[in-house]
A protein has these predicted regions:
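Internal hydrophobic scaffold segments of catalytic domains
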Residues: 1-16, 45-54, 59, 134-167
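A conserved beta-strand-loop-helix scaffold within acyl/acetyltransferase catalytic domains
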Residues: 93-188
Length: 188
């Protein structure tokens, strides 16, 4: 209401200062949990916003699938295109060690790739390091996360895969684990 009174015709959000932080609402699959540090909201938020007249403008996709299902769905296609990909790119496991050793290059790469996205707000390297440094790198799976580099060693792309940390996040009491403390290498 305040924004309308100020003359706003459109409001986009939520954006928590930058798109590197919480910047979206979840609309479905609440039973699936969330990735560590992924935005989370109660299921009823979307109905409140709809009643206020807000509409969905942009969507995002998070995939919650067992690894074997993903392999079955894309395995044959990947094997078919792999020889062509390997003519131009090296495909290797993305490890926390590579991530941390190449954080400045990853910062520039992420800025370049996402810079044209809606509401993208650049952040300083120091902020990137705080959001995407060691505690971030220790959460993704180094066996299934993939790094693509050009033949001369430049970062060409990557995707990160996370285990299902929901059981850990449900632990309460003295043995509870915060999202910030999750570490893939720990034998929970």
């Amino acid at each position: 209401q305040w924004a309308q009174e100020q003359g706003a015709k459109h409001i986009y959000g939520p954006i928590n200062f930058t798109t590197f932080a919480a910047n979206r609402l979840r609309l479905d699959h609440f039973e699936r949990g969330a990735f560590p540090s992924e935005p989370w909201n109660p299921p009823y938020y979307s109905s409140i916003l709809a009643k206020l007249g807000y509409k969905i403008r942009y969507r995002y996709l998070s995939t919650f699938s067992p690894l074997n299902d993903i392999i079955a769905a894309i395995g044959q296609d990947y094997l078919r295109v792999k020889p062509k990909l390997e003519q131009h790119f090296n495909l290797v496991a993305m490890t926390p060690e590579f991530w941390l050793a190449n954080l400045p290059e990853l910062y520039g790469f992420v800025d370049e790739v996402f810079g044209a996205n809606f509401a993208y707000t650049p952040i300083s390297f120091e902020t990137f390091q705080a959001h995407c440094g060691e505690s971030f790198a220790l959460k993704f799976c180094p066996k299934t996360s993939v790094l693509a580099t050009t033949k001369d060693g430049r970062i060409a792309g990557f995707f990160l895969v996370y285990p299902d940390y929901r059981p850990l996040m449900r632990i309460t009491g003295e043995h509870s684990i915060s999202a910030a403390a999750i570490n893939y290498a720990e034998p929970y």
